[in-house]
Amino acid sequence: MKQNHNQTISPELKEKLARIRHLALDMDGTIYMGSTLFPFTIDFLAEMRAAGIGYSFLTNNPSRSVADYLKKLEGLGIEADEENMYTTSLAAIDYIKAHYPSARRLFLLGTPSMVSQFEKAGFESCADDPDDVPDVLVAAFDMTLDYQRLCRASWWASQGVPYIATNPDRVCPTDQRTVLVDCGSICRCIEHATGRRPDITLGKPDPNMLKGILDRHG
């Protein structure tokens, strides 16, 4: 029998929920950990739908494209579409379009999945070539990171190319027995080599992350 979720919400909570139109829900470490869905997630989302509250999934992890995240959510039993997703890749794309409108070619220190998200948005990815000068350098959580590309990113940072970090996290949450070195730690490496920090670091808690959701659902 299908549960009537409205009956599980107290009157006091209903009153508070009535003032909420849309929620921004973190993903990594909040609705799931690695590949493990938390036991309360499905029921919580059902309660929000029953209360007429919309929600978006947001994540500081740019290593997957929106399509990849939707596939992961589907595998965990969560229904979602592109309108429900906002990643730090999308935040970086929105930021570049707003602040560097003429930028077309980017040096992207990120996974192939992330690069595909930028290419889908109309950008081109620069080669690892000192003559292929980027309009903007983007450093991200790159699980495919290799030494040559780290050196090239450091070179462009040292040359004054506009420099954006997708998120501040030092490590990415995981249920595996390892430490996933994240964007913040990669940027510290570049800083140690060049003395330069990113011009802006997006992702939570930067307000640009919520601005993207407000622009879509506000």
What is the predicted function of each stretch?
Residues 1-27, 31-218:
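HAD-like aspartate-dependent phosphatase fold
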